[in-house]
């Protein structure tokens, strides 16, 4: 009996079945983002406004969660102190994989106007950040745009990608 070797690889060298499954999995992940509500300062007010009836992020599949075990996106909004950074890191570690982080506001991105010994000068020193959202304080429309950019990023990445191979996005 003759045996034929069939090549199931695409032009990129990846198996066709796996790339199709990756696209399906990433589509599901991108359309059901569940951010962890973690507001630290002024930006938290804008984050809360984004969940209210005027902007209603729930209609896009973005449902805010209070437990890190139910969340896959962490939005760090506001100034992060060094004392509080241990708690933020613990929450990040408790989140399920895959997980993404949005740094919201100038204080979270670079420490803002608080250049002191007690302030972390950028959340990315504690937690790997996927999207940097500039502004003081960014409007809910900007947060909505950041979530849309995160959805595009999730659709592009491989389903087995870990946090070390991710690339950061800066929204300007």
Swiss-Prot record:
Record-linked NCBIfam families: nuoB_fam, PRK06411.1
Q: How does it assemble?
A: NDH-1 is composed of 14 different subunits. Subunits NuoB, C, D, E, F, and G constitute the peripheral sector of the complex.
What UniProt keywords apply to this chain's record, in alphabetical order?
Answer: 4Fe-4S, Cell inner membrane, Cell membrane, Iron, Iron-sulfur, Membrane, Metal-binding, NAD, Quinone, Translocase, Transport, Ubiquinone
User: What is the official name of this protein in its record?
Assistant: NADH-quinone oxidoreductase subunit B
Q: Which cofactor does it need?
A: [4Fe-4S] cluster
Q: Which family does it belong to?
A: Belongs to the complex I 20 kDa subunit family.
Q: Which GO terms describe its cellular component?
A: plasma membrane; respiratory chain complex I
What Gene3D superfamilies does the database record attribute to this sequence? 3.40.50.12280
User: What Enzyme Commission number(s) does the record list for this chain?
Assistant: 7.1.1.-
User: Gene of origin?
Assistant: nuoB
Q: Looking at the keywords, is Cell inner membrane present? A: yes
- Report the protein's function: NDH-1 shuttles electrons from NADH, via FMN and iron-sulfur (Fe-S) centers, to quinones in the respiratory chain. The immediate electron acceptor for the enzyme in this species is believed to be ubiquinone. Couples the redox reaction to proton translocation (for every two electrons transferred, four hydrogen ions are translocated across the cytoplasmic membrane), and thus conserves the redox energy in a proton gradient.
Task: Answer yes or no on keyword Zinc.
Answer: no
GO BP annotation list = aerobic respiration; electron transport coupled proton transport
Tell me how this protein sits in the membrane.
Answer: Peripheral membrane protein
> What is catalysed by this protein?
a quinone + NADH + 5 H(+)(in) = a quinol + NAD(+) + 4 H(+)(out)
Give the signal sequence positions.
none
| Residues engaged in binding [4Fe-4S] cluster | 42-43, 107, 136
Q: Which InterPro entries match?
A: NADH_UbQ_OxRdtase-like_20kDa, NADH_UQ_OxRdtase_20Kd_su
Q: How is the cofactor bound?
A: Binds 1 [4Fe-4S] cluster.
One annotated GO molecular function is: quinone binding
Q: Cellular location of this protein?
A: Cell inner membrane
